[in-house]
Amino acid sequence: MRHIAAVTIVTAVLLFTQTSASVQGGENKIPQMVDMTPAIEEPSELHALSAALMDGDSGRVLYEKDGKTPLANASTTKVLTCIVALESSPGDDYVQVSQNAASQPEVKLGLQKGEQYYLEDLLYSLMLKSHNDTAIAIAEHCGVTVEGFARMLNRKAKQIGCKDTCFITPNGLDAQDENGKHHTTAEDLALIMRYAIKNKTFLHISQTRDYTFSEITGKRTFSVHNANALLDMMDGVLAGKTGYTSQAGYCYVCAWEEEGKTFVVSLLGCGWPNHKTYKWSDTKKLLSYGAYNYDYETYWQEPHTSKILVTDGVENMQNIGEKVYLRGKCSVTSEDREKEILLKKGEAVTCKTEIPQKVSAPVLKGEKLGRIAYYLDGKLIDSYPVYAERSVEKISFKWYTEKVFHDFFH
């Protein structure tokens, strides 16, 4: 399985190098000296200043190069802009163009002040051709102001799990405010793409090759072509977004699916002019490494639950003074036992029973005592609660007198 996947991606990237010149001119002329052998070892000599390869299913980082370093990320910002817009406003909303939106620098659609567009149409302009003016129009519609939309972006980034992301502009143009410079990290950017590909509308937009739309009166019509060249060079590409500014350099984030495995690659600072092609060779190395080395494995292990001492516990009159024990119960389904995670050869999931050696009475049946936890590289990946299989009463004068009274009269 590993070797088949590796050959598939290597063949695809080889075709990419041979045909890309006809797709987007100079940007995709990948040097013929790129090593096309399967990536077995961890990628080395990446061009990107910061990079991450993530398991799109679990969110686990499989490889990183300075993945937590904050850097400018240019138009890859638009992935989050698109998602926040999709989640906050319906696609048939009318978006009115402001002077601020119309005056944005290239790359832009050429919006004019006062024009109206459907939000959905502008999202295609945003993601397919990375137009800066449509990003501002979308931001002002969804967040009232660019600043308001930036707060929405940063709030969403935190909800997704980003640790060091601060977005100031919806289009990713370099900017700075009282919170610092516009930035993210490779790991955060991968998390954002991992979240985005769960949205079916986002996937549909990202995979559309060509799209035509008009402003609402029909006076002007536009056609946009998807600039994510990887879509035409490899099967299984789910989404991708390029970016460039003078501070960020060339950036890229993509998601790719092969034989049920989903990988997310993010690259920051991946060369400056004239090195537009660096992002493609780095992407190839990371995807090859993931496809070749990682496969899904079940990780369920039968837990060992030892007896738990119940202090001050009592079961009946005959056992007064004896130690009382109980066992925990962990309920799992057949689906739980078949759960899988991407593992590299030599990696193993560790199962730990995290319950106390003793508890104090009273204990109620079904009371949570602890958990069965599964760890990979010291990080918790799954857990199941452990409950008391029966109740244990606490011995006391009241309990004793009630038992004596009950036994005497019955």
Question: How would you name each of these model-derived features?
Answer:
Residues 2-22:
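Sec-dependent N-terminal signal peptides of Gram-positive bacterial secreted proteins and lipoproteins
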Residues 21-200:
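Active-site-adjacent loops and short helices of periplasmic peptidoglycan-processing enzymes
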Residues 2, 78, 390-391:
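An N-terminal domain-start capping segment
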Residues 180-410:
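Domain-terminus/edge residues, biased toward the C-terminal soluble/receptor-binding domains
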